[in-house]
Amino acid sequence: VSGGGTEQGPGGVEPANDAEPGVVASSGRGRRRLLIVAVAALAVILLVAGVAVVRQLTEPEPPPVAASPTPTVSPTPTPTPTPTPTGHAPDDRSYDLADLPTVDVFAVIPALPVDDAPEEGTTGEVARPVPAGAPVFAEPGAAPVAALPHELPYEGSIVPIIEREEHWVRVLLVGRAGVPSAGVAGQLTGWLRATDVDISVLDTSIEVSVSAGTIDIVRGGERERVPGEFAWGTEATPTPIGRTFVMSVRTASSLAYTRGHPIVYLAVQSPTLDGFGGIDVAITAFHYHDVHAGPISNGCLRVGADAIARLTQVPPGTAVRITP
């Protein structure tokens, strides 16, 4: 239809871009150039990445660092302790007892020690030499200084043990180490070899308390009070204090003051008298006397008739402990 209408494009549809044809061509070429550059850059990136991957796959890993070995500590062996000896070594030597002084009530043997712990008790045992007798030692391992026979005229061969070892026993003895005038007093002691003695239990002992005025016989832990009061030594002639033992029990008819009662002789002697009654011993004892109270004697323990009757029943070797 002709007339005054607007011209349309082909198909009657208005074009979307009304730019000039030359400008459109130039824009297309720029896009292609950018695409080529991008592809080239991508190729370079892939090439570099591939090289890195190949290198990572082909290069050997560094060897692992070896861990420092932990030093082996060898344990120090614990030394085996040396056994502590339980006593003195045995002595198997033979000795001629005939060459040694005899331990008896009259003996004075300076080589033997006096009791250094008179306030102590005993083991509750007694020792008696075998029939051949026993050498007596001041110290185990030294040469013997005396001999203790199996039997003695005035007894005293059954002795209480105050210390016991496997091979040795320490005992109380009759006799003296010296005399009071020379400054020596106290209960005599010595060591015996265990192989030279027979050992037995004696569970009886006598305990005297001067201050309490009591005499007890102790047997198996049970105490029996000896009846009556008793007398003891004066200040000048005191009763010996400490441990000793019953040497013998016998009657002395020549001593009228005993009225015929037996005397219980003790091993310990006076701490102040060298002798008594014209002889060179100053033995102490339990004995009867009509007057038996207070500090009036020469060291003996004077008792009444009932008391001496009971005391004479204890066997030789019975331990006696006298306290102030």
Model-derived regions, located:
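SH3/SH3-like beta-barrel superfamily modules
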Residues: 149-195
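Hydrophobic membrane-insertion alpha-helices, especially the h-region
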Residues: 38-50
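Exported/periplasmic cell-wall-interacting domains
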Residues: 75-83, 175, 199-203, 250, ...
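Terminal targeting segments of Actinobacterial cell-envelope proteins
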Residues: 1-34, 65
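C-terminal region of N-terminal signal peptides and the immediate post-cleavage residues
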Residues: 48-74, 80-82
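Gly/Pro-biased beta-strand-loop elements
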Residues: 187-287
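Beta-loop motif signature
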Residues: 85-157
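Short, surface-exposed beta-strand-loop junctions and turns on beta-sheet-rich folds
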Residues: 143-144, 176-179, 221-225
